[in-house]
């Protein structure tokens, strides 16, 4: 993922609880000129395909860590615009709201920066845990790796959804909307390739995903016969 460049900065369990969407708002990121913005012409279908000699768990863990770092960097670029005053709740397109659940299952409505701090700490804790994401050669991966990865990716999706919903104009002003599109496309093609997220978890950005993947080479023409379609009926 060397195509991404950015700078950034930046509490533990979560079950997201999106609220029903409200009437449609203007979505600048769906405009043709915005959809065409990207920083790479890479074929993400081929890029995410599991190489024959690579272990699936290793592929999953490596990408999860990389996606976390890149989403964290991207959010860091616009974090000064994401404040408790500007973003009193963690929302996505359609004003879908994400609620945080603590260890006891109690849900909380947080400001967006609080929510991002919580999920950043949670994901960082998971990927830094040798029992969850082992880094030593020969150390086996736990059976729970895929489930942990799914949860982490769901949380990372919330950050991307919030950026498109609440900070897309900031991204345009800073000239990073092409980076955001490329990161989101890579992230989603990987998730769908390995069935890491459910449709209901990502439907708030399905229109954007379909528009973005139209810019990619036809996956049916790839050499990799097992590559999946991203656009779903």
Mark where each language-model region is.
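Helix N-terminus capping/helix-initiation residues
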Residues: 55, 110-111, 198
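Amphipathic alpha-helical interface segments within eukaryotic helical scaffold
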Residues: 72-149, 153, 157-165
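The feature captures two recurrent sequence modes
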Residues: 1-105
């Amino acid at each position: 993922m060397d195509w991404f460049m950015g700078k950034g900065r930046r509490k533990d369990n979560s079950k997201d609880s999106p609220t029903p969407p409200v009437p449609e708002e203007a979505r600048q990121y769906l405009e043709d000129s915005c959809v065409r913005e990207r920083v790479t012409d890479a074929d993400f279908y081929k890029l995410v395909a599991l190489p024959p000699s690579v272990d699936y768990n290793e592929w999953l863990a490596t990408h999860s860590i990389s996606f976390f770092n890149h989403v964290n960097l991207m959010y860091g670029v616009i974090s000064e615009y994401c404040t408790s005053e500007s973003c009193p709740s963690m929302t996505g397109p359609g004003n879908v709201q994400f609620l945080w659940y603590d260890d006891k299952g109690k849900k909380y409505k947080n400001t967006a920066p609080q929510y991002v701090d919580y999920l950043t700490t949670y994901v960082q804790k998971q990927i830094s845990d040798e029992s969850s994401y082992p880094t030593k050669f020969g150390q086996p991966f736990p059976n729970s790796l895929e489930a942990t990865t799914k949860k982490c990716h769901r949380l990372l999706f919330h950050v991307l959804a919030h950026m498109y919903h609440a900070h897309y104009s900031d991204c345009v002003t800073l000239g990073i909307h092409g980076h955001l599109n490329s990161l989101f496309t890579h992230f989603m093609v990987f998730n769908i390739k390995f069935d890491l997220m459910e449709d209901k978890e990502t439907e708030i950005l399905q229109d954007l995903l379909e528009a973005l993947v139209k810019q990619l080479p036809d996956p049916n023409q790839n050499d990799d016969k097992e590559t999946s379609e991203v656009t779903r009926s």
